[in-house]
Amino acid sequence: MNYLGKTVLVLSCVGLISCSAVPVVTHQTPPTGTTSQAIQSATTKSLVCVAHPGDQANGQERYPGSGAEIGQRVEKAVQQAGWQTVAIKGDAGQSAAECVRRGGTHLLEIRVSHYEDNMTGWSGKPDRIELQLRLSPASQPAQARQVSYEARSNLVASAFAEWGNAKPVALLKGDFDHLVNRLLRDSR
């Protein structure tokens, strides 16, 4: 293969992975709180209401649409774990009632404690996302299990791969999917 052919091959590979964030998981906790047996549903139907967070901000920087993106990504992880989902608004105090009204058996609340989009591929500063997931029976929201997840983008990988600026929500993959699966395991 000549030099031009190798160059085209390398650029094609870079093009395939552009816009993808490479996460460095900085913190994740195993499920804590009420045991999974205590939050089992009495029905065979398992529908998880995913309470989408509001749009995120970091200082003066606002990220329109980020709440929906995070909610959709969490829904995808729940579906990959074998559950059905329905999206609801994450209104404080009203989520459980809305979930029951929509026929949900479980409520999954998302609390984002940090969201920072620094255009890592261009700025050299890592993107960050930190969130907590809280799972409870829709009819008994006080009996909950929860996990935490924190990740930042890998600066070296982002410098080569993130040409189109992946968003912090792109850091929710791999270990995140496994963590959501662990949270949901045995909760049916």
Roles of regions detected by a PLM:
Residues 79-99:
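Short beta-strand->alpha-helix linker/helix-N-cap micro-motif
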Residues 71, 75, 130, 173-180:
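Extracytoplasmic/secreted envelope proteins and their assembly/folding machinery
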Residues 138-188:
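Short secondary-structure boundary motifs at beta->alpha junctions and helix caps
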Residues 92-144, 154, 158:
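Surface-exposed short loop/turn segments
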Residues 10, 16, 46-47, 96:
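Mature extracytoplasmic/luminal segments of secretory-pathway proteins
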Residues 56-65, 120-121, 159-166:
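Second-shell loop/turn segments in exported
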Residues 19-81, 183-188:
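A structural "domain/chain start" motif
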